[in-house]
Regions:
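Glycosyltransferase specificity loop/lid
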Residues: 1-153
Length: 153
């Protein structure tokens, strides 16, 4: 549980801290609730890797100082595609006609996300992700979690 300042207040010393990876869709209606959930998990002593693109991460409010050590912002650069406007990393940055192109660029994050999971799993106990939380747009990410024996939702 968190105190008024966001500091962690443990309700049970027997609870094992988890490492949760959260990778929301690249829209602020998904990013902001995902970040709020990340901070709630961190306030309960869990470690969170919050994955998005560099520009989206830069536009999010920073976690409170007491939680910042437990919330790792992981930047995966969105691949550039012909026809996709420069800097278009969120659906806010796009006309609706470019939505499918944005999804195609997003699919280009499959290999970098897998590499991130490989690195996180290689760090061993305490750093290895326990859970990967995904949006429905991540049709390739569940397989990446399964391949590494990480639970996903």
């Amino acid at each position: 549980m968190a105190g008024a300042d966001g500091a962690v207040v443990s309700s049970s010393s027997r609870q094992r801290a988890m490492h949760v990876v959260i990778f929301p869709w690249l829209a602020f209606g998904h990013l902001l609730p995902g970040l709020e959930f990340a901070q709630r998990l961190a306030s309960r002593g869990h470690r969170v890797s919050f994955v998005s693109t560099p520009r989206n991460l830069a536009r999010l409010p920073p976690p409170p100082p007491a939680l910042a050590p437990r919330v790792d912002l992981v930047a995966l650069p969105l691949p550039r595609l012909d026809g996709l406007p420069d800097g278009a990393e969120s659906t806010n940055d796009l006309p609706s006609a470019a939505f499918e192109l944005h999804r195609k660029a997003f699919d280009g994050l499959a290999a970098p996300f897998s590499a991130f999971l490989d690195a996180a799993c290689a760090q061993g106990p305490g750093s290895r992700p326990d859970w990967v939380l995904l949006d429905s747009f991540h049709h390739w990410a569940a397989a990446a979690a399964v391949d590494r024996k990480v639970l996903h939702l």
